[in-house]
Amino acid sequence: MSGGKYVDSEGHLYTVPIREQGNIYKPNNKAMAEEMNEKQVYDAHTKEIDLVNRDPKHLNDDVVKIDFEDVIAEPEGTHSFDGIWKASFTTFTVTKYWFYRLLSALFGIPMALIWGIYFAILSFLHIWAVVPCIKSFLIEIQCISRVYSIYVHTFCDPLFEAIGKIFSNIRINMQKEI
């Protein structure tokens, strides 16, 4: 039973006891205190970003991973000069690299702003409109489902049970005649 330390008005140092079983206001005080010491709280707005691996969830592995060999290929028997091939490779690679950088410099921040607004609106609508509508619908449909269930058990179950008993006695004999 130990806890945090505090100093009273006379300057005496005291420890605040933390009970093993907790109390009605803070159950499991000791366990909670130990967890808080071990865990670091991370905020989504202040987390560090990885400048080396910019696609940690591999969203674009199959989509935009386009290299020179994926676009331009010369089959056997149809080859250009080696110098032309090397220059084409360099031109393609450098152009793609710098044009992407130019486009991301010009449109990256505005597009991030637009997508941030879009996903904020989408999250807002999902939290404050879609989920409450679905919950409301599920609550309202319960009375209909009960009436429907009574109807099925009263009329449909006996009917299909009788039909099943009728057809359960049908026997088919297959004979092969020579």
Curated annotation (Swiss-Prot):
Coiled coil: none annotated. It is found in: Golgi apparatus membrane; Cell membrane; Membrane, Caveola; Membrane raft. GO terms for molecular function: molecular adaptor activity; oxysterol binding; protein kinase binding; transmembrane transporter binding. Residues 105-125 dip into the membrane without crossing it. Keywords: Acetylation, Cell membrane, Golgi apparatus, Isopeptide bond, Lipoprotein, Membrane, Palmitate, Phosphoprotein, Ubl conjugation. Signal peptide: none annotated. Residues 82-94 are annotated as: Interaction with CAVIN3. The modification Phosphotyrosine is found at Y6, Y14, Y25. Residues 149-160 are annotated as: Interacts with SPRY1, SPRY2, and SPRY4. Residues 2-94 are annotated as: Required for homooligomerization. GO terms for biological process: caveola assembly; cell differentiation; negative regulation of endothelial cell proliferation; receptor internalization; regulation of cytosolic calcium ion concentration; T cell costimulation. There is a cross-link at K5, K26, K30, K39, K47, K57 (Glycyl lysine isopeptide (Lys-Gly) (interchain with G-Cter in ubiquitin)). A lipid is attached at C133, C143, C156 (S-palmitoyl cysteine). Homooligomer. Interacts with GLIPR2. Interacts with NOSTRIN. Interacts with SNAP25 and STX1A. Interacts (via the N-terminus) with DPP4; the interaction is direct. Interacts with CTNNB1, CDH1 and JUP. Interacts with PACSIN2; this interaction induces membrane tubulation. Interacts with SLC7A9. Interacts with BMX and BTK. Interacts with TGFBR1. Interacts with CAVIN3 (via leucine-zipper domain) in a cholesterol-sensitive manner. Interacts with CAVIN1. Interacts with EHD2 in a cholesterol-dependent manner. Belongs to the caveolin family. May act as a scaffolding protein within caveolar membranes. Forms a stable heterooligomeric complex with CAV2 that targets to lipid rafts and drives caveolae formation. Mediates the recruitment of CAVIN proteins (CAVIN1/2/3/4) to the caveolae. Interacts directly with G-protein alpha subunits and can functionally regulate their activity. Involved in the costimulatory signal essential for T-cell receptor (TCR)-mediated T-cell activation. Its binding to DPP4 induces T-cell proliferation and NF-kappa-B activation in a T-cell receptor/CD3-dependent manner. This is Caveolin-1. It comes from Sus scrofa.
